[in-house]
Amino acid sequence: MTTRYWALGSAACLLALVHGVPAHGQGDPPATSASASGNTVTFGGQILMRIRTGSGGFTAEQRADQVAQRLIPILSLKNLKPEDVTVTQTRKYQDATISVRGKLLVTVDKGLSQANGNNDPGDLARAWADNLRKVLPEISVQANPNDKQQ
């Protein structure tokens, strides 16, 4: 079992424990299934991103593993909102990063952007961030309204 499978499986278990699974007849359980195949990072059956190239001595699959590992603490952040997902790029055609509430998720370099059909890493990072802005708030931990320490 690869680290990515373990990491995403752990995130699914964490979400199941936090959200709870309804008893029989109380509706559908929350979507917490996670999987990854090769260089594709998925959660709850939704593709988050495809890491098509290696970089910095890491293979594409190892980079996807890193993203999956970084995703676990991000998913434990309470009440994620679309604006919590940010893209940083200092200049056009330079590397871009995607962060969630200041936590680095992935760095998009020129090789990765070109392998995904983009010339500018910022364009690919913004496309991935748009997808994450839709998905992460749906699957992140929701704060208990009775919890006074939010």
Question: Which sequence ranges carry the predicted segments?
Answer:
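C-terminal segment of classical bacterial N-terminal signal peptides
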Residues: 16-22
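Bacterial N-terminal signal peptides that target proteins for export
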Residues: 1-10
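N-terminal targeting peptides and non-cytosolic leader segments immediately upstream
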Residues: 4, 22-150
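Core hydrophobic alpha-helical transmembrane segments of single-pass membrane proteins
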Residues: 12-14
